[in-house]
Amino acid sequence: MDSRVLGALAALLAAAAAWVMRAAAEWLWWRPRRLERSLRSQGVDGNLYRFLNGDLKETVRLTKEARAQPISPPSHRFLHRINPLLLRAISHHGKFALTWIGPTPRVSIMDPELVREVLSNKFGHFAKPKAAPIVKLLATGLANYEGEKWVRHRRIINPAFHLEKLKRMLPAFFSCCSELIGRWESLVGCDESREVDVWPELQNLTGDVISRTAFGSSYAEGRRIFQLQSEQAELLIQAVQTVYIPGYRFLPTPKNIRRTKIDKEVRALLRSIIEKRENAMKMGDVHDDLLGLLMEYNLKESEHFNSKNIGMTTEDVIEECKLFYFAGQETTSVLLTWTMILLGMHPSWQDRAREEVSQVFGKNKPDFDGLSRLKTVTMILYEVLRLYPPIIFLTRRTYKPMMLGGITFPPEVQLALPIIFIHHDPEFWGEDAEEFNPDRFADGVSKASKNQMAFFPFGWGPRICIGQGFAMLEAKMGLSMILQRFSFELSPNYSHAPHTKITLQPQHGAQMVLHRL
């Protein structure tokens, strides 16, 4: 090869290498240092930036130490197990505490009024952080979209979660709960009592519910998707415990290969279900499950604007279905599990809830009107959501300079809204903030704390969780039917060890002793 060509190639490679090095230096050093100086100059104190890792290594170390031992005797003072680094940062640096997610600064916002300002997002200055490609393999959909795409998808999906539509899902809720009750009655048998780890049982229950309510007659395929998505979630948890390196997902490691294989299978299953449903709709066969409603309203949206480009594509529908699975299954299963655990810890409240269920339903099938009248059960569920919210924090990012609480946040700063820390804060909940006291919700959510924004387990504002009504209705149905058939207490084998694996879960299971009534 001509020496001039070789020289030109060498110069080109050198220029490319120099550009990569400059970009890496900017991303990993100069930008974090600029952002840190800007924040500290305005009084935001916190952890110093550590090259590349930020607080990751310290987070892993502290969390490993905190989770080594369960909480004995069981109590609701457990924030040190959930996020020991943030707890220490807030204790040392105040409620505007700076921590680091790799080279990205994260400032925690503990003031409910500032949380309200961020979540209301009136001027569009706060966006959701961009999801890493590896996260998108699990789910994107409505929860991750911004701007016009979010508006369009929310408008299409919203009618599927209206009250009248939720009422039609009660038979599916009842069928799944009946199967669970029947299985537990078989386990207890003639012994009258039996130890059961209710955590995997309730995961299966809510997985079955979302399979039936999302896909109806395609239930078997739906359950396979649930199993695959659960495995994808486990792989994601392992991945987020390491520093994110752009392009790493393309390396043919066993886990990367498995992630890609799961994603392809899930997409193929969903595409097959959607195509069958499209063909059925053309024949006039309409379904009332979530997929059917989603496709019906998507078609209406396209017809209203007289353009196929206005509605969702098949890929969009696939992403929304994946999100149904993650959000619909995870959040309700952990809510029901922690509710059983806390009612096992506090039997007087279990008795009060059972008495109310008995007064409203007797031994009859729970119906919508009766579920709506369950005041004590609702108070209990709210208090469980306060102490053990399924999602422990929300995040937003600035994409241009934004004033908040007297501080001008530069672009590309993450704002953490630590739901669980605010839910446990005595400043808003009183000295009994870390005690189980459903009576605080006796007069409703608005009067439960010193600031109404101190309780936001489903988020708040225009992006409040679209499925909160679905989750609460399912939880009321499940809990009511369990209380009708069983009393329960914590097993001696139960270890109280809340920890986070995307959602707040019992680390060692939820072993309960069930007594048939």
Curated annotation (Swiss-Prot):
Disulphides: none
The UniProt record lists the keyword Endoplasmic reticulum: no
Signal peptide: none
Location within or outside the cell: Membrane
Membrane topology, as annotated: Single-pass membrane protein
Chain residues that bind heme: C465
EC number(s) recorded for this UniProt protein: 1.14.14.-
Pathway the protein acts in: Steroid metabolism; cholesterol metabolism
A GO BP annotation: steroid biosynthetic process
Keyword Zinc: no
Top-level class of the enzyme under EC nomenclature: oxidoreductase
UniProtKB keywords: Cholesterol metabolism, Heme, Iron, Lipid biosynthesis, Lipid metabolism, Membrane, Metal-binding, Monooxygenase, Oxidoreductase, Steroid biosynthesis, Steroid metabolism, Sterol metabolism, Transmembrane, Transmembrane helix
Main subcellular location: membrane
GO molecular function: heme binding; iron ion binding; monooxygenase activity; oxidoreductase activity, acting on paired donors, with incorporation or reduction of molecular oxygen
Record-annotated membrane-spanning stretches: 5-25
SUPFAM superfamilies: Cytochrome P450
Pfam families hit by this protein: p450
Cellular component annotations (GO), alphabetically ordered: membrane
UniProt record similarity statement: Belongs to the cytochrome P450 family.
Function, in words: Involved in the biosynthesis of spiroketal steroid and saponin natural products from cholesterol such as diosgenin and analogs (e.g. furostanol and spirostanol), plant defense compounds used as main precursors for the industrial production of steroid hormones. During the 5,6-spiroketalization of cholesterol, may catalyze the 27-monohydroxylation of furostanol-type steroid to an intermediate product that undergoes a stereospecific formation of the terminal heterocycle to yield diosgenin.
Protein name as annotated: Cytochrome P450 CYP72A616
Species whose genome carries this gene: Paris polyphylla (Daiswa polyphylla)
